[in-house]
Amino acid sequence: MIIGTRAVMYAPVEGPALFAILEDAAYQNMDGMMPYPQARGVMRLRAKSHGGVFVAMSNARTVQSQWENTGPGTVETPVSGYSTAIHPLASPLKDATPWVRWLNRDELARLADATIGARVPHTAVRALSKALESGPVLLSIPQDSTSEALSCAKCHRQARCAKCSGPLQLPADRSESAPRCQWCGAASIHWTCPGCGHERMRVVRVGAAGTAAELAGLFRGVPMVLSSKAQGLVRDVPCKPMIVIATPGFEPRVRPVSNERGAAGHEYRAVAILDAWTSLYALGVDARLDTLTAWMRAVSLCAPRSRGGQALILGETDPAIAQSLMMWDSRILASKDLDERMETGMLPTVAAACVWGRRDAVMTLMQRIGALGGDWAVCGELPGMLGPVPIAQPDTVDARELEATADRVKAVVRVPQSQRAELAIRLHRETARHVASREPGELRFRIDPKDLI
């Protein structure tokens, strides 16, 4: 048996082996070095060549997995194809998971909670205080961030591009008045919210800070532990009454103080998801999936309902995310995401590649592969190319020295899944020509990118 991180996808094996990957959509499974392989695709390819079995495991089902076992038009490629879905039975699943409640405005109004709008309403304070009588409580908070998102000034729905549904951002050049799409670069002139019809936007800064100081006033005298990238990782905490505040990926394990409590000594008595509203403004194609994955990972540390465990979602979020967590059925979100991607022509319903580098090099490549005025100018009824959009200069000094200009852009090319292999061949051929002919400027590409931004 070979167990490891991303690099283990290349480990030598013999015979019809089992190739299993955990959290196949995680950023850590995407190699950041040329040729940018994905662990999921590499392991599926190796399983096929070895006559073995490939298994993708995660708390939240990815859109790729949903498409492979339910999506119409699924195409068999070396790195994807038809698969069999595995989901736990309802009865044992209910016994193994906590009671999950969504305390949004409607639910708090139904409960006649007078603290509607508070970061931690009284209903949540009572539930968490009760849980603290018998053990630790985990509060999951968003990562601190300086990123900005645009939303409707009235209903707070995220502002998205009418052309490709990408997130809008303020232009880097403040002389421009119209926000631009981060995916296709189109200017959003005369924007109107599709939810309420409002015409104004507002800037939302996503992140959380000062949580421990704020909660100290709600839970007086209760010990608190903070685990985050900024504060440092806390690996485990004793199974005693305390509040543990952690960002996604930094949740400590519960360490039993004795063997008398059995499995209960390894569990949080309650888990609360704070600032759920930040999920409404998360960027990226897999933003909702990443949110659900992080929340499921945190809630999985909670005691099951048979031992009194409960989880609370505090604040507004996408109903599909909340329902998936409350039912512990990520197929709800995966199905919705897949339907939306079929409408907008996004992965995995199409094959796509990100191409970036100097503007003239990118545009020349797009023309040569047929994405500009050629046979790939359209993908179905949608444009075959998105962009180009300006991107930041490389962080490293060496990469900066390779740039003859600051005009660095990224574009996306989309083709039907049946032409995925041809897309890879054309991109490889044209980038090789660019290098061999010593044409100036950076030029790179990535097939099936995790994000389009």
Each language-model region and where it sits:
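Accessory helical-bundle/CTD segments and flexible terminal tails appended to RecA-like ATPase motors
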Residues: 82-112, 219, 231-288, 297-453
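Conserved helicase ATPase motor motifs in RecA-like P-loop NTPase domains
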Residues: 25-27, 32-73, 77-89, 143, ...
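SF2 helicase catalytic motif II
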Residues: 6-50, 54, 266-282
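Conserved interdomain linker/interface between the two RecA-like ATPase lobes of SF2 helicase motors
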Residues: 55, 59-153
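Conserved RecA-like ASCE ATPase "motif II neighborhood" in helicase/translocase motors
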Residues: 2-18, 246-260
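Flexible beta-alpha connector loops of hexameric P-loop NTPases
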Residues: 26-37, 112-116, 200-204, 279-289
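Loop/turn-to-beta-strand initiation segments
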Residues: 1, 15-18, 48-55, 136, ...
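Cys/His-rich short segments
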Residues: 119-220
